[in-house]
């Protein structure tokens, strides 16, 4: 279990039960270790303790989301609970935190989150449903409220800046744009992908960027569901991270590829869609697997990676060079060393399997025709 996200003031990394806040320059500001539940004593038929203890499911971080305005961190855990932490700045720029309320139990694990600060709520999705939580309400326990669903697995979640639209994408090629808070009112669908839609982001001028397993990156009008442009990627895409470039109306996209050591790079123009273009991809050492990627406002790319043999985690940092239209490695960046110090000898036992997202066609005739062909050829030879 792991995640990496970049906010305006912090870089946040989580692996297993540890969450670390870094400054944008890579300095360590605060660490949170998820408290594990105590073992439960078994009881016999007479409800008397029998001396045995049942170990609870480990509570490791699945994903998290931070709200800068309220300074609240919401964390989804692998034991089907999620927790909140209230953060506070101390002298010297360091942070401290305290649990906020009780653990909230959900029917299924929450796999993606987005804060909606104007409404004071958090959106969270499990496999096929999206829920609303009153995560910023400090006076009550935020029980989940169902707001929308899909017929297949939800893979990505985005919310417009004005909080009028919730956009969700799924394994069955669909991108759904729902009104908020009247989520039963579907504004439109963005249809055109032919494989799972792994990543979506709303950008300025009410535009939407999406990437898919069909090897395409697409730009949409989010209010009408109209496709504005399409770029052909080299490989299927898993997800992406995006930031606005300093000049013009362009968005730099770093697309995490199905090829485990590659990030594809694109510049998407939202005022002149036809001007969008692909740059040369970034390929790292074959001994590493890219687990997650984040792009900062200064166009600094952070890659959370894992060594294939040792399973140890590593952080890689790159700076974008506009003249060369490529990312350049920053091996001496402080974030690299500080990340290593915080997660030294931490290993990832299991990497997420994305092969299950692709369509599987059932063909009952191919084998039959092959056998028939062999049989006919054998008869001719006689």
Swiss-Prot record:
The keyword Glycoprotein does not apply. InterPro entries: Trm82 (IPR028884), WD40/YVTN_repeat-like_dom_sf (IPR015943), WD40_repeat_CS (IPR019775), WD40_repeat_dom_sf (IPR036322), WD40_rpt (IPR001680). One of its GO terms (biological process) is tRNA modification. It is found in: Nucleus. It holds the Pfam family WD40. Forms a heterodimer with the catalytic subunit. This is tRNA (guanine-N(7)-)-methyltransferase non-catalytic subunit wuho. The gene is wuho. Residues 49-59 have a biased composition (Polar residues). Its main location: nucleus. Keywords: Nucleus, Repeat, tRNA processing, WD repeat. Pathway: tRNA modification; N(7)-methylguanine-tRNA biosynthesis. WD repeats lie at residues 149-190, 192-230. Belongs to the WD repeat TRM82 family. PANTHER family: TRNA (GUANINE-N(7)-)-METHYLTRANSFERASE NON-CATALYTIC SUBUNIT WDR4, WD40 REPEAT PROTEIN 4. Required for the formation of N(7)-methylguanine at position 46 (m7G46) in tRNA. In the complex, it is required to stabilize and induce conformational changes of the catalytic subunit. Residues 40-59 are annotated as: Disordered. GO terms for cellular component: cytosol; nucleus; tRNA methyltransferase complex.
């Amino acid at each position: 279990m792991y995640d990496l996200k970049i906010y305006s003031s912090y870089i946040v990394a989580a692996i297993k039960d540890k969450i670390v806040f870094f400054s944008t320059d890579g300095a360590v500001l605060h660490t949170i270790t998820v408290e594990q539940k105590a073992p439960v004593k078994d009881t016999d038929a007479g409800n008397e303790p029998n001396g045995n203890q049942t170990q609870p499911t480990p509570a490791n971080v699945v994903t998290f989301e931070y709200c800068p305005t309220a300074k609240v961190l919401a964390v989804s855990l692998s034991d089907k609970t999620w927790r909140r932490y209230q953060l506070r700045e101390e002298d010297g720029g360091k942070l401290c935190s305290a649990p906020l309320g009780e653990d909230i139990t959900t029917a299924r694990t929450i796999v993606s989150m987005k804060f909606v600060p104007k409404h004071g709520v958090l959106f969270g999705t499990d496999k096929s449903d999206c829920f609303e939580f009153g995560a910023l309400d400090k006076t009550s326990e935020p029980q989940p409220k169902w707001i929308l669903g899909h017929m297949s697995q939800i893979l990505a979640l985005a919310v417009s800046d004005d909080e009028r639209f919730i956009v969700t994408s799924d394994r069955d090629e669909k991108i759904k744009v729902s009104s908020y808070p009247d989520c039963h009112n579907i504004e439109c669908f963005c249809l055109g992908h032919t494989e799972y839609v792994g990543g979506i982001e709303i950008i300025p001028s009410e535009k939407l960027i999406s990437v898919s397993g069909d090897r395409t990156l697409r730009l949409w009008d989010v209010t009408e569901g109209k496709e504005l442009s399409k770029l052909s990627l080299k490989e299927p895409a898993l997800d992406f991270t995006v930031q606005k470039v300093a000049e013009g109306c362009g968005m730099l996209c770093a697309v995490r590829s199905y090829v485990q050591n590659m990030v594809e790079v694109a510049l998407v123009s939202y005022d002149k869609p036809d001007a969008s273009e692909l740059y040369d991809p970034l390929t790292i050492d074959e001994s590493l697997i890219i687990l997650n990627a984040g792009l900062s406002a200064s166009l600094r790319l952070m890659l959370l990676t894992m060594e294939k043999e040792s399973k140890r985690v590593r952080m890689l940092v790159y700076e974008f060079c506009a003249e060369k239209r490529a990312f350049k490695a920053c091996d001496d960046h402080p974030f690299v060393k500080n990340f290593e110090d915080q997660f030294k000898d931490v290993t990832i036992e299991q990497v997420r399997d994305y092969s299950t997202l692709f369509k599987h066609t059932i063909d009952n005739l191919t084998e039959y025709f092959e056998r028939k062909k062999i049989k006919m050829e054998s008869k001719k030879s006689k």
